[in-house]
Amino acid sequence: MHLATGLAVALPFIGAASAQYFPPPVEGVTVVESKFDKNVKITYKENDICETTEGVRSFTGHVHLPPNNNDFGVNQNYSINTFFWFFEAREDPKNAPLSIWLNGGPGSSSMIGLFQENGPCMVNNDSNSTTNNPYSWNNKVNMLYIDQPNQVGFSYDVPTNVTVNPINDEVTVADFSNGVPEQNNTLLVGTLGSQNPYATANNTQNAARSIWHFAQVWFQEFPEYKPNNDKVSIWTESYGGRYGPAFTSYFQEQNEKIKNHTITEEGEMHILHLDTVGIINGCVDLMEQATSYPDFAYNNTYGIKAYNQSQYDSMINEFYRTGGCRDQLIHCRDVAAESDPHFYSHNETVNKICNDAGDFCGQKLEDAFESANLGFYDIAHPLNDPFPPQFYKGYLSQAHVLADMGMPVNFSQASDAVWKAFHTVGDYGRGDVRGYIDDLAYLLENGIKVALVYGDRDYICNWFGGEKVSLALNYTGTENFHKAGYTDVKVNSQVGGQVRQYGNFSFTRVYEAGHEVPAYQPEVSLEIFHRIMFNKDIATGEIDIAQKPDYSTTGTADTFHIKNDIPPEPEPTCYVLSMGRTCSEEQVKAVKDGTAVVENYIVKSPAGKKQGPPPTSTSPPSPTSSSEGSVKEFSVSVLGVSVLAAITFFL
């Protein structure tokens, strides 16, 4: 798919209360120097923002790694300063397991998950205060949110002054030696990472190598985490469909090397006791999931039809025809296996072949969805989708919040540098060393739970493709998993979805949920999370899977027959820190010419207008064509950004 090249940088918007240019001075930060390497350190600060439950502690900070700290074969000539936000469990943190949370992208901040989905608080519409989240995932689990790879979110290489155009999210490295320009509606200033795409991991496998080094430091030397339960899980979302399998399998491989003394370096011999990899609406494998895009857009359980029959047939043909998407992906993976088997992305020929394959598949099978004017993350919502609210971006630009967190840089929701790095080497079309689907099989064979959870209104990483991935796994339990039927997921008095489960492996369809499932169905999502983390069956939460490892659901062979109603359209909310995703042409123009009335980052005038119900006929507008190698543009020139820039990456 063509991912976005724009940023949604949460720098103060002109006229906002407590607006400022740069982060306030860093104060009250604890510095821990590594006992293994004097050049490695942790800086952190305890705070009581977001998690306000009495007695529950939270910490924000960075793990600082010097240049050339990564594995042999990876050119890492830059510093890595990886941001984390750790929340103790609200209940019995000493005996609670820990889960890492990672958003996708590539280049998206895990603050998306924290503030929009499953963290201890939700930001109010003033973008300056929060409300406690009773469905927070740290109710019973210690949660570690990480911004990765380098330059994502609050992570950085070198603090660098920048300007930001909030109309199109363009970030430009700036020289303020002659003074700092005054902010206005089309110019913001602040401090981020260098914006250098060569100063970050350039593919999923290299990101796994980098995050393993982070984990070695954090789990051994972060002084505020000393649990009795040392189980570690990874939960992730979207492009995390690649991160989850790659990172967890890499961690497991490193564990094996530590055990057999292949790894003997002091400070890098901490075994991570892996428990679960959970993937929410993950884009795991393009080969397996590519046809799910036209399939879902044409025939879904909501009766929404983005394409007519001829458009659908054309897209399917682009996958199967000679020289089409499938053939190009096969060629990409064949040459990668031969010429870049360890996935370092040093081979420019492999990089170009895989880049071209990913771009072709995106253009031919996905991009035309724009023409239906439907939400990429929620097919039942309009393209300018106000849900989940974006208020956290303004919150993370407030001076008092940055001061409480001890941040030396401003916040950016997505890193253009990271996206460029991954895109250039063709990460989207490739698999990692083993292949992401085979990674999941490897984890299951090693006793690690694998949970696939998909909201059924998401287009961009839809449940059709997720189900295909689940059925493509080849492991010792494959036959029994295929025989397992779908059954209801019961949460209190409601049915939240359906699940197919055999032992440690499950695929769950969550009803009435878009891409960020916990934002839509917080109670159901929390219960699914708890059942998986604490070894209970997903359907009822009453059966101990650890005691009954051959547990299997019974029911129908598929779940497509269960249909859904289209929900009411949400009220439009144009948020100036997410203009490309939430604002109309008229509103963007008003912001640009200075006539918009803005309050707490929300455009009050001109008011937004509802789009109307999504198409349910077979004759939506025809997709506009695009030239080879380009991304289609909105016909509205005032926006000046591609449709995929507007949707801002895989979240």
From Swiss-Prot:
It is a lipid-anchor; GPI-anchor. Its EC number is 3.4.16.6. The keyword Glycoprotein applies. One of its GO terms (molecular function) is serine-type carboxypeptidase activity. GO terms for cellular component: fungal-type vacuole; plasma membrane; side of membrane. GO terms for biological process: proteolysis. Residues 1-19 form the signal peptide. A lipid is attached at S625 (GPI-anchor amidated serine). Residues 604-630 are annotated as: Disordered. Its main location: membrane. Keywords: Carboxypeptidase, Cell membrane, Disulfide bond, Glycoprotein, GPI-anchor, Hydrolase, Lipoprotein, Membrane, Protease, Signal, Virulence. Gene3D superfamilies: alpha/beta hydrolase. It catalyses: Preferential release of a C-terminal arginine or lysine residue. Glycans are attached at N77, N125, N128, N161, N184, N202, N260, N299, N308, N347, N410, N474, N504. Disulfide bonds join C50-C121, C325-C361, C332-C354. Residues 612-623 have a biased composition (Pro residues). InterPro entries: AB_hydrolase_fold, Peptidase_S10, Ser_caboxypep_ser_AS. The active site is at S238, D458, H515. It is an enzyme of class 3 (hydrolase). Extracellular serine carboxypeptidase that contributes to pathogenicity. Belongs to the peptidase S10 family. This is Carboxypeptidase S1 homolog A. The gene is SCPA.
